[in-house]
A protein has these predicted regions:
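Conserved ASCE/P-loop NTPase catalytic core
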Residues: 32-644
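Long, basic/Gly/Ser/Thr-rich N-terminal segments
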Residues: 1-40
């Protein structure tokens, strides 16, 4: 199918369909969505979640306390927002059941650039997936999306409709609009003259989906929400005639759907008054002498915390406060999820194919998240950041607390302050374009751009110093360690095999040393007594500064014996035990001087040296670095390595 046929097919599928009222009622018997409220239809569009048993994955089990969590494919690209999405779905479920939430404003509260607008756009987009049914008369569709049930009286007609068509009583009760009331009068009460149109909600055409934004005190009035008289029609109709009214307000257009109110609490208070009755009573008054207008939809509002705090602290606004269902949308606090956000943003730009050195996005996400975290008590903020990403630090930081302990101490407002994803992405844009020749990103340029931007932003002194401390006290030393390992592993061709050999040898020596037995090397025939074994073990332990060798050796041997039981009697991988992996790496790379001739970009004295250097560069490029980045990062590493 070519693009033109595909477009035509899509256009035809979205066309309105017209039914008689009898056909519509028959449809209601088989299809509940024909009379479902806005929350129900939105739930249909969101679809069923994928249930994830976090007990099956160690990282997730630490974050979600072994709970079974719901993940919704409709919100797949909203990373680190499980709690906010779950609360939104909870609101919709309760509203769909006709509970108090049906009468409340769904209010997304969060910091700038935290994803509130993106969530709102996704909800509006999902609303387009399920059609609505609207009254029509004489070929004209109701301008306020009157549902056909507005024609029926709950007291008089509910019993018959429930008996004949299985329509629950609670779906009746929506008032008739002035437009529908006028047509009913013109038809002499004959409701069969009405038609019902199946319409697809549309953001573009503002069908059941509307958006309103705050203006200033002087030029915004409630007509933005409720509409006003269309002066062009006064030539033909009286001022209080329903047909003289322009149903252009956001509440008019969003009936049976969703109305988004951007930065709601920036709007003058008088503009918000129609929302009170629209939510609680399902109707509101227009600006002229016409009867009340129906509203049976969702009001979705969002704003930053400062506006909410100002609004909440004003005692005159108590009526609103009781009608708001707050969903907090904080910044992402997990490194792995923040990285996915950056990758998503990059994928929607020309930089999607630009080289990005390993560690760049991770370093930026760490910086962003550190700025959002509250300082913990008796623990390192860096450890807290790692715990928030689901890491277990019991072997590396005895002072680290559990995820829940950190959360409890930080309180409910953690993640509501700090640097936004927008700020981070602007930084990333500058990093990619830092070099005038090569469009690529690497952490060294990132450090420079971040330091420069901290000065430019003119943060309060204490805050700026805190950000610089994150950079110089943690991120730069950590990256120096990371790039050092990258360089060293690229230098050692048989890195993995070499590491496993040291691991196996260490375990064997330690086992015989603990048992106080001599050991004969099967390959060389050399005999090691307990003293010789101790000397060999110390060669591996000393570069890592192991302070209690006896306990360390017992710990390692016990770990390996347990692991062998689950590994057909074979030793585990040398990287499987964090403590010993660190020890082995430090042993392997304790003498970096021999690296220098290979990794430096100076002129080589021999062909052999040049070949080793070229092989090293090729291996670094296989890891994801460009040739230019290899040179930059090696020179940076050689310059800073002795500082840490």
């Amino acid at each position: 199918m070519n693009i033109f046929d595909h477009y035509r097919q899509r256009y035809e599928a979205a066309k309105d369909e017209e039914f008689t009222l009898q056909e519509f009622l028959t449809t209601c018997r088989q299809d509940r969505s024909a009379y479902a409220n806005a929350a129900e239809r939105l739930l249909m569009a969101i679809g069923e979640p994928v249930m994830v048993d976090t007990a099956q994955e160690p990282r997730l089990s630490r974050l979600f306390s072994n709970r079974v969590i719901a993940r919704y494919p409709a919100f797949e690209e909203f990373y680190g927002m499980e709690d906010a999405i779950e609360q939104i779905v909870s609101y919709l479920k309760h509203a769909a059941q006709g509970l108090e939430e049906k009468k409340q404003i769904l209010y997304l509260l969060g910091p700038v650039g935290g994803g509130k607008s993106s969530l709102a756009e996704r909800l509006k987009s999902l609303m387009q997936l399920v059609p609505i049914y609207v009254l029509s008369a004489n070929g004209e569709r109701s301008p306020v999306n009157d549902h056909p049930f507005c024609l029926f009286n709950p007291q008089e007609d509910a019993q018959i409709l429930e008996k004949e068509y299985g329509i629950p009583r609670r779906y009746l009760g929506t008032i008739m609009s002035p437009w529908a009331a006028k047509r009913l009068h013109e038809f002499g009460g004959d409701i069969t003259k009405f038609r019902v149109v199946k319409v697809w909600p549309s953001i573009l055409q503002q069908i059941a989906i509307a958006k309103t934004e705050p203006g200033d005190e002087n030029n915004q009035d409630i007509s933005a929400l409720v509409g006003k008289v269309d002066i062009r029609k006064l030539e033909h109709y009286a001022q209080n005639d329903p047909d003289a009214y322009g149903y252009s307000g956001a509440l008019c257009r969003a009936n049976q759907g969703i109305m988004e109110f951007v930065e709601m609490f920036k709007a003058p208070i008088k503009v918000l008054h129609p929302l009170l009755t629209a939510t609680q009573e399902g109707n509101y008054n227009g600006t002229e002498g016409i009867s009340a207008l129906p509203f049976n939809g969702i009001i979705l509002a969002h704003s930053n915390e400062s506006e909410w705090v100002t609004f909440r602290n004003n005692k005159n606004n108590e009526a609103f406060l009781d009608r708001v269902y707050i969903v907090k949308v904080p910044y992402c606090l997990r490194i792995s999820e923040e990285i996915k956000i950056y990758e998503k943003l990059l994928n929607h730009s020309e930089l999607t194919h630009a080289p990005c050195a390993p560690g760049t996005l991770e370093t930026l996400s760490r910086f962003s998240i550190l700025s959002r975290l509250k300082e913990p008590e008796n623990s390192s903020i860096y450890s807290k950041m790692r715990v928030y990403d689901g890491e277990s630090l019991k072997d590396t930081d005895p002072k680290a607390k559990s995820y829940q302990e950190y959360r409890d101490y930080a309180g409910v407002d953690e993640g509501m302050n700090g640097l936004s994803t927008r700020f981070a992405f602007k930084i990333l844009s500058r990093v990619f374009n830092f070099d005038h020749v090569e469009v690529a990103a690497n952490p060294v340029h990132l450090f420079y751009v971040l330091e420069q931007q901290i000065e430019r932003e003119q943060f309060p002194q204490e805050q700026a110093e805190r950000y610089l401390e994150f950079l110089k006290g943690y991120l730069i030393p950590k990256y120096a360690e990371f790039i050092g390992k990258e360089i060293q592993t690229a230098y050692l061709e048989s890195y993995s095999e070499y590491g496993q050999n040291i691991f196996d040898r260490y375990v064997t020596y330690a086992d015989f040393w603990i048992q106080d037995q001599e050991y004969r090397d099967p390959d060389t025939g050399q005999l090691f007594d307990r003293e010789s074994l101790n000397a060999e073990l110390e060669k591996i332990e000393k570069p890592a500064g192991i302070s209690n060798p006896k306990d360390f050796r017992n710990e390692i041997v016990n770990f390996v014996l347990r692991a062998r039981a689950n590994n057909s009697g074979r030793n585990p991988n040398w990287t499987s035990y964090e403590k010993l992996r660190t020890v082995i790496e430090k042993k392997m790379f304790s003498n970096t001087e021999e690296l220098l001739p290979v990794i430096s970009f100076n002129a080589k004295t021999s062909t052999d040296e040049q070949k080793k250097h070229d092989d090293f560069v090729d291996r670094m490029m296989e890891k994801g670095y460009t040739r230019k980045q290899v040179r930059l990062l090696c020179e940076w590493y050689l310059r800073v390595r002795k500082s840490f």
